[in-house]
From Swiss-Prot:
Homodimer. The keyword Transmembrane helix does not apply. This is ATPase ASNA1 homolog. The active site is at residue 77. Gene3D superfamilies: P-loop containing nucleotide triphosphate hydrolases.
Length: 380
């Protein structure tokens, strides 16, 4: 985290939906601004594995369904936890979520597929040489699949799409695909001009009537599509990213890395959801009557030793609770100092049970709209 302080200064109000709104009132500690923003088409939810991305994306989708005509929750995480979250099986086709008439879910695989990659022409010869030409662009196979996927998504008639993404590394790779496509397809287009004579000669010598112009028409189409996707990514009126983390070192570090990459790619990000936060048992930590104090009262009044033993066990639990609060407060303070002036930071409480099933997700989603102070430990 040594770069945290210097990197924080690079994050400006340009990350927010409304660059003219940089006052404290705008950065409320809830997601109301996100839900009420009817111009958004794509909302990406991402972060480190195991921090509650799926729960958060499902909750956001539920709230959006109350405001928008039609909502699609799209899982690009290979683990596909959305089915488990809703206790309902989803596939690669949009499926209506139980109890809703405008909220759909689908689970897709964004990894490389032999069935779709490089099939830009019916010619077997061309399909064999294109991969060779693109060997200098590692990951182009996945990028082409991603381009086809995003084109399909753009053709879907939903008011807004919520992306439940894979862990940070995979997500950053996915967001880099438009740049990779632009470079690779630009390379092929330039290659056409350099090798135009050779390609024409090959076409005249072969018997399978290769349609080189048709091939480059497809390449130009892919290039135009990739540019359009990139423009959509970088339009804060249409696309935004919600970062999800927990108040622990690795998660906060990955969140910082993710926000830096989003900033470099000019992708809007103005919301951070911090899950599994231990809140004080009362409005202030100092108001908690400690087990140590109770134990002193017991000793003063000569109550039986067996009851004293129970209080000692409770004291151990109290120590764990306070230690957890102190540890989380360290990272909550870092989050507040780094992003408090530019982001909606929403702290969600550690709950007693797993958030599975529509009712529990719906309850969690309501909490995303409720403002809560960042619970920094302060015993005095």
């Amino acid at each position: 985290m040594s770069k945290a302080g210097s990197d924080a200064s690079s994050i400006s109000c340009s990350l927010s939906l409304d660059s003219d709104s940089c006052d404290d009132e705008f950065y409320e500690t809830n997601l109301n601004k996100l839900i009420e923003n009817t111009s958004l088409n794509w909302i990406f939810v991402g972060g480190k594995g195991g921090v509650g991305k799926t729960t958060t994306s499902c909750s956001i989708a539920i709230q959006l369904a109350k405001k928008r005509e039609s909502v699609l929750l799209l899982s690009t995480d290979p683990a596909h936890n959305t089915s488990d979250a809703f206790n309902q099986k989803f596939t690669n086709k949009p499926t209506l979520i139980n109890s809703f008439d405008n909220l759909y879910c689908m689970e897709i695989d964004t990894t490389f597929s032999e069935d779709t990659a490089f099939k830009i022409n019916k010619s077997d010869f061309l399909n064999s040489i294109i991969p060779e030409l693109l060997q200098s662009f590692p990951g182009i196979d996945e990028a082409l699949c991603f381009a086809e996927l995003m084109q399909s998504i753009r053709n879907m008639k939903y008011s807004v799409i919520v992306f439940d993404t894979a862990p940070t590394g995979h997500t950053l790779r996915l967001l880099a695909f438009p740049d990779l496509l632009k470079k690779a397809l630009g390379y092929l287009i330039n290659l056409k001009e350099k090798l135009k004579g050779t390609l024409n000669m090959l076409q005249s010598l072969t018997s399978n009537e290769m349609e080189f112009e048709g091939m480059y028409d497809k390449i130009n189409h892919l290039n135009t599509m990739s540019i359009s996707i990139q423009e959509n990514f970088q339009n804060p009126l249409k696309t935004t990213f919600v970062c999800v983390c927990i108040p622990e070192f690795l998660s906060v570090y990955e969140t910082e890395r993710l926000i830096q990459e989003l900033t470099k790619k000019n992708i809007s990000c103005y919301n951070i959801v911090v899950n599994q936060v231990v809140f004080p048992l009362t409005s202030q930590d100092a108001n908690i009557e400690s087990c140590e104090g109770l134990l002193k009262q017991i000793k003063d009044t000569n109550i039986k030793d067996s009851f004293s033993s129970l209080i000692l066990k409770a004291k151990e639990l109290e120590d764990v609770y306070i230690s957890r609060r102190k540890l989380q407060s360290k990272y909550l303070t870092q989050i507040k100092n780094l992003y408090g002036n530019y982001f909606h930071i929403v702290c969600m409480p550690q709950l007693k049970s797993e958030i599975r099933g529509l009712d529990k997700i719906a309850s969690f989603s309501e909490m995303l709209l409720q403002s809560k102070d960042i619970p920094i430990y302060s015993p005095q």
